[in-house]
């Protein structure tokens, strides 16, 4: 048995059909937490939800584009209709790369990196915090990155790094604002994890650096996140 019991709690997790997001959903479900999965692809959502339901909890798949105000508002409405509450919010959706010199990074690409990796986090918090404030309880976890704190010495990821650095600063600001309202806000900063958003080319290019600079000499895996609640 784990240390925590989230019976009757409801967690909303973005980017939750694979990788870190799915790992965190599984970890919470194993501690009896009901789950609302948010991602773009309905087919992948249904697959992930079916797997999580085998753990004996309720799981609502919610197709949603976290870069859209309307889509996020509609997702919130669906979740509240189903569960009547939101206790935990995990902002995991994001995308990596591209790896290129800052002078060569197109402005459109940079704006997309900021929108998905940082602005979407603000949007989700803005949308769901009122429900937490009303309940006097909430736990928000934002997935940042180690690159939001230190630069990559061999591969230029300045666009991605700046967005994740923004997530860290946003976390600090919102944590201070909500500290007296029963709501905690924290960020985790993972290292390199294989994911669809990173892509095969980036992982192959990044692996030599990861192996040289990581004591365990490996990347993270979704399984590493399955014990978050233990």
Where are these regions (language model features)?
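Conserved glycine-rich cofactor-binding loop
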Residues: 10, 17-19
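The beta1-alpha1 cofactor-binding region of Rossmann-like NAD(H)/NADP(H)-dependent oxidoreductases
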Residues: 42-43, 63-75, 107, 224
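Catalytic Tyr-X3-Lys loop
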Residues: 103-123, 137, 141, 167, ...
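Active-site helix of classical SDR
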Residues: 125, 163, 171
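Residue(s) in the substrate-gating loop at a strand-loop-helix junction
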Residues: 145
